[in-house]
Amino acid sequence: MSIPIYYVDAFTDKLFAGNPAAVIFSDLNDSKLMQNIAAENNLSETAFIKKENSKYLIRWFSPSCEIDLCGHATLASAFVFFNYIDKEANEFEVESIKNGTLKVVRGEEFLYLDFPRDNYKPSNNFMGIEEVLGIRPLELYKGRDDLLAIFNNESLVKNMNPDFIKLCKFNARGLIAVSYTHLTLPTISC
């Protein structure tokens, strides 16, 4: 059996940069085989896209398990679709089992991804997250899968050195750390 595999670096225009993902357009249905291929690829995610009737179905696998949603592997899949599968297309829609329809639109220079919105709720577990991050966030929220920590200073986020072992003890897939920043708006005169 021969299965073409595309390796794509998302979020970059340079080789060997960005966030790599493997992309496979095929009729595979065997979850165990898909898991073995993802383990062999040994990238954070491998996306499998299958055309069924007029729709594309997508599944994502890490080297160890199937996952519910992956942004960079979806963007990588759209890149392959636009450049190798249907060069005339301007939209790439895929159906995900747990997240419904996901859409990527081709722009002049970028791909635009429309993903489901998470419903973040305030969390009071500041002591635990302070242990993980070494600093206390201004605000902390818990989404379906991730924690969202908000800081008042961009340099705190840039210089953060989380303890990932401690982070694993939280009931979360990951942590999103962001900061408030000040924007300088251009002056427009007529």
Question: What is each residue range found by the language model?
Answer:
Residues 1-69, 74-183:
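Active-site proximal loop and beta-alpha junction motif in alpha/beta enzyme cores
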Residues 182-190:
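Single conserved hydrophobic/aromatic residue that forms the stacking wall/gate
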